Amino acid sequence: MNRNGLFSATVSLIAASFCLGNSLPVQAETCQALMPVGGNNTTVTKTVSQPSIPLFGPIGLNNDWNTDFIVESNAKYKNYKVILLPTSNGEYSIRTYLKYSDNTADNFYDQKPSLTANKPLVITGFPRSQQQPYQVNVFVGDLVSLGKGYQVTVEGCR
């Protein structure tokens, strides 16, 4: 090896050891799956269906486009992850909310992404600084989503 090559290798080793020696330790997030309201499994499987007219007249339309997940009252999560696994290819209309006990909600995702079957979409939302939500709402529905299937899980992360 010539002298310039040795110098270059030495500088590279010094730079690498400096970067490794001065890096901060990375602390892994720990996440816990939340239970859906009225469910007994942390993963919910749905197909977006056409809305129906309620039994007592067209006051509004019934649909199964919302899924709520329960946040335990003593939980102190830094963020919430919605993991949506499409079982169909195509465009999905997705909105996610953190719902608070004062009857307010923060929307943290409102898009119509084009998704690929079996390729998960992970959406992260952050709670208010002095409040924790009591539910995480996942809304998947709209005309563009009709007939498309998906699985959804929500995790609270510390």
Where are these regions (language model features)?
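Exposed low-complexity, polar/acidic, P/S/T/G-rich flexible segments that act as propeptides
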Residues: 96-100, 141-158
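Solvent-exposed serine/threonine-rich low-complexity stretches and specific carbohydrate-binding patches
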Residues: 106-116
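Bacterial N-terminal signal peptides that target proteins for export
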Residues: 1-12
